[in-house]
């Protein structure tokens, strides 16, 4: 988190790069394409961030003048018209602090804050130039733009907001309007009701698809809807929280070294941007996230972990996917929380909850980094020589 250096990065499915030596056969190449192993989920995969995105919503609320230290209602659901927005497993927690809302990942607290910010920005009458606090804050964290890692083909992701809604409408309006007029004749032959549904939907999108609606704002607040990010973007965002507000460009390369061992160019840390948030907001996030691991949704995978010696700041996420019965599992973290050094993010598609699926692997990585065996911390057992990332270069 101090310089943006990437110590390790992995993606699955994977393959042996040695397959390219001497040329790859058509059969081998076809197998690689079919397995999707040629692309990296870490830098190219785009996934709804779920509740890991609530750090963005929290910062946006603070920017809009909402107290980070007040209590907020956490009912089991909020109803807008015929649509019900629920907490995970429909749990209700009553009146709780915002820090506690992060710990237990209370959706309805963030729905409420998003709703107020949406109304303050003009609601349905807002223009494309109206304030969009959550989206604006997300861009500060580095979402919606490439991280700048020294690898080709990185995805920029997408930040849901009023700007994206207008751009999407401008790109799809003609198609929506044409479908609204034609009424889906082919579909109508076999399923008239489905054709009616599609037609009604396209009529609405044709006329008003540019509007950033209340439901859009609520979904965006919990990392659902149109927002998609890469795991690397998430790691850099949490690194920025950990280091006090600096968004680094991630780097895999430490230096360019000649065949004789001469260092041609040593790569220095590169700052992409800053969070540009009040120190009090960053402090609130840094003070709150360790509670997720000790008393919240990230507690289970760290039971028995020496958190008194190596405190871990974290946020879980379970992002729902359209047409998929199993959510995307996220666990975003950094440690030690009191003196941040490393940020670790794990995402598993169709993995269920962040705590259940991704969290245990995050724990194992921290155990390897810090030389942890049970509750004992021994830097000499670290996978890193002397317990520190190497500053020297292989020659």
Features from the language model and the residues they span:
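Beta-lactam-recognizing serine transpeptidase/beta-lactamase-like catalytic domain environment
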Residues: 1-51, 56-346, 394-395
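Short, charged, low-complexity patches
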Residues: 98, 234, 354-363
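Short, gly/Ser/Thr-rich active-site loops of penicillin-recognizing serine hydrolases
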Residues: 263-270, 361-395
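A generic structural motif
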Residues: 349-352
């Amino acid at each position: 988190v101090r310089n943006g250096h990437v110590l390790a990065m992995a993606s699955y499915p994977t393959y042996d790069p040695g397959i390219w030596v001497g040329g790859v056969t058509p059969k081998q190449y076809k197998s690689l394409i079919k397995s999707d192993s040629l692309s990296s989920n870490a830098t190219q995969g785009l996934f709804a961030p779920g509740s890991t995105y609530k750090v963005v919503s929290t910062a946006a609320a603070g920017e809009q003048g909402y107290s980070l230290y007040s209590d907020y209602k956490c009912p089991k659901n909020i109803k807008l018209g015929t649509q019900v927005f629920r907490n995970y497993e429909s749990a209700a927690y009553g009146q709780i602090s915002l820090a506690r809302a992060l710990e237990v990942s209370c959706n309805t607290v963030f729905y409420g804050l998003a709703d107020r910010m949406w109304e303050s920005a003009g609601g349905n009458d807002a223009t494309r130039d109206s304030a969009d606090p959550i989206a604006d804050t997300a861009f500060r964290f580095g979402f919606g733009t490439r991280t700048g890692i020294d690898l080709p083909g990185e995805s920029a992701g997408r930040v849901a907001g009023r700007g994206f809604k207008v751009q999407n409408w401008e790109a799809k309006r003609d198609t929506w309007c044409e479908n609204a007029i034609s009424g889906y004749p082919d579909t109508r032959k076999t399923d008239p009701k489905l054709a009616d549904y599609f037609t009604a939907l396209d009529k609405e999108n044709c006329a008003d698809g540019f509007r950033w609606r209340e439901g859009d704002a609520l979904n965006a607040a919990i990392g659902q809807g149109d927002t998609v990010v890469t795991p690397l973007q998430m790691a850099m965002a949490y690194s920025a929280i950990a280091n006090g507000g600096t968004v680094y460009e991630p780097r895999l390369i430490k230096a360019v070294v000649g065949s004789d061992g001469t260092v041609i160019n040593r790569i220095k840390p590169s700052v992409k941007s800053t969070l540009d948030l009040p120190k009090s907001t960053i402090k609130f996030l840094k003070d709150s996230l360790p509670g997720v691991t000790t008393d919240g949704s990230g507690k289970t995978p760290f039971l028995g972990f020496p958190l008194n010696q190596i405190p871990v700041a974290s946020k879980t996420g379970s992002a729902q996917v359209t047409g998929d019965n199993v959510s995307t599992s996220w666990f975003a973290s950094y440690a030690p929380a009191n003196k941040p050094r490393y940020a670790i993010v794990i995402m598993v598609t169709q993995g269920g909850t962040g705590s259940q699926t991704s969290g245990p692997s995050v724990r194992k990585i921290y155990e390897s980094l810090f030389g942890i065996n049970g509750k004992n911390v021994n830097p000499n057992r670290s996978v890193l020589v002397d317990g520190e990332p190497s500053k020297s270069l292989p020659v």
